[in-house]
Amino acid sequence: MNTSLTNAARLFTAGLRALLVLTVVTGIVYPLVVTGVAQGLFPGKANGSEIKADGKVVGSSLIGQSYNLPLKEGRETPEPDLRWFQGRPANGLGTNTVNTRYELILSGATNRSADDPELLQWVQDAKAAVVRDNSVPGHPVRPEDVPADAVTSSGSGLDPDISPRYADLQVHRVAAKNGLPAERVQELVDEHTTPRTLGFIGEPRVNVLELNIALVELVAPGAGH
């Protein structure tokens, strides 16, 4: 009997020691080491890849934003503010219905098949809107000019980047809405186009938030987003 109690006590003590050691190592030491390394080597990425304008954090280079006009009465969705470059559609985004205390965005894809009738209608409507919104006198946009990323959302619905082709398509509209030379706006796009990583990984891309922040510097004071 005493032997059984002794063995049980020994096992309990060993388990308790293991629990305490692992708690300290994995719950305190490891997080502190990882945090220290991240802050020391990659402080920007460790803090969320924040983007600042006028000394204030205005977003993250990893998360897309919408550039819309105030929601009008009677409408379910706001209209895009055509003074600014627009990102990809966000059809997969949902709303937080579990904890309504916080206004959280639930990211995700539509999970619809390529031949889904509603998805096809979304794409057709989005293409028509891109053609309509970006056609300016002397520079009409044709349906075949519209790239895929202009009418389809990403897997997360929060893609911060667009293709250079989609950015180029918006140049004349942005220039006209802001009273700027199209050539200067095109230069802005070119300056904010990131090439393929290492020259062969991924595709060239344009971060919409960074581009619009640069655009603010060109427009009249007080016209910022």
UniProtKB/Swiss-Prot annotation:
Keywords: ATP-binding, Cell membrane, Ion transport, Membrane, Nucleotide-binding, Potassium, Potassium transport, Transmembrane, Transmembrane helix, Transport. GO terms for molecular function: ATP binding; P-type potassium transmembrane transporter activity. Pfam families: KdpC. It is a single-pass membrane protein. The chain crosses the membrane at residues 18-38. One of its GO terms (biological process) is potassium ion transmembrane transport. It comes from the Bacteria. Its main location: membrane. InterPro entries: KdpC. It is found in: Cell membrane. Residues 134-161 are annotated as: Disordered. One of its GO terms (cellular component) is plasma membrane. Part of the high-affinity ATP-driven potassium transport (or Kdp) system, which catalyzes the hydrolysis of ATP coupled with the electrogenic transport of potassium into the cytoplasm. This subunit acts as a catalytic chaperone that increases the ATP-binding affinity of the ATP-hydrolyzing subunit KdpB by the formation of a transient KdpB/KdpC/ATP ternary complex. Belongs to the KdpC family. The system is composed of three essential subunits: KdpA, KdpB and KdpC. This is Potassium-transporting ATPase KdpC subunit.
